[in-house]
Every structure is written in C-alpha cells, then in structure tokens.
Amino acid sequence: MAKPAQKLRRRERKNITSGIAHVSASFNNTKITITDVQGNAIAWSSAGAQGFKGSRKSTPYAAQVAAEDAGRKAQEHGMKTLEVMVKGPGSGRESALRALQSVGFQVTSIKDVTPIPHNGCRPRKRRRV
C-alpha cells in the first residue's frame, strides 16, 4: 500500500533582527549556522551543501560561498545584526566572516570559541608527509 504524500512545510517567515552566527571551520569543511539569540537555528549552510566535494570543501572560497548562502537565508527572516562565534582551526574562518559582512550584516562582536583542552584526551598522531 502506498504511503500518503507528505505535506510540504513552508518555512514561516520569522521577524528576527539580531542573531548569532556560529562558524565551525574544521580542516575538512566549514559549517555556518545562524541562530536567534536563544540559539534556535534560523539558517545554515556548509561548503559540502554548496556542492564542493573532497578537498575543495576546505578552501576559503568554499567557506565564503557557504557563508553568503546562510546569510541570504537569514536575511529573508529580517536579520540585520550578528554576533559571530568562530570555532576550529580551518582555513575558512576569516573568509566566512568577511562574506557575512559583505552580504550586509552589521557584525557587533567576534568571539573565538575554539575548545582548548587543559591536557584532556590524547591527541591524534602527527602526520608525516
């Protein structure tokens, strides 16, 4: 028996003026999530979601494209000002921040929230190329 067709859920347009952009820049990918002040996700994007595959995901250009996409989605909900929280050692940190500013957001603060261990877990072995 066939399943009933799922209803298409439209994204309701929220009216939020300020929010937080969480930029997670790893060595392999860059993810950008834009949330309201409480932490509820409004828009997100990543380098992989923009069609970049493999080692191209880790480039600054891929991070820029992903940040512009997430920024445009957030602006549809009326967002104007952002706090930016950057996490991780990746190459897309600065380019994602610059892209968010170029989309037209007023960036009020920039925080680096990269987790630094106080000698916790043993790190992975060094790469020898």
UniProtKB/Swiss-Prot annotation:
InterPro entries reported in the protein's UniProt record: Ribosomal_uS11, Ribosomal_uS11_bac-type, Ribosomal_uS11_CS, Ribosomal_uS11_sf
Gene3D superfamilies cross-referenced by the UniProt entry: Ribosomal protein S11 (3.30.420.80)
GO BP annotations, alphabetical order: translation
One GO cellular component term: ribonucleoprotein complex
Entry keywords, A to Z: Ribonucleoprotein, Ribosomal protein, RNA-binding, rRNA-binding
UniProt keyword Ribonucleoprotein, yes or no: yes
Pfam families: Ribosomal_S11
Entry GO MF terms: rRNA binding; structural constituent of ribosome
Family of this protein: Belongs to the universal ribosomal protein uS11 family.
Subunit and interaction comment: Part of the 30S ribosomal subunit. Interacts with proteins S7 and S18. Binds to IF-3.
UniProt cross-references to HAMAP family, sorted A to Z: Ribosomal_uS11
Function description: Located on the platform of the 30S subunit, it bridges several disparate RNA helices of the 16S rRNA. Forms part of the Shine-Dalgarno cleft in the 70S ribosome.
Stated name of the protein: Small ribosomal subunit protein uS11
Organism listed in the record: Rhodospirillum rubrum (strain ATCC 11170 / ATH 1.1.1 / DSM 467 / LMG 4362 / NCIMB 8255 / S1)
Gene name linked to the record: rpsK
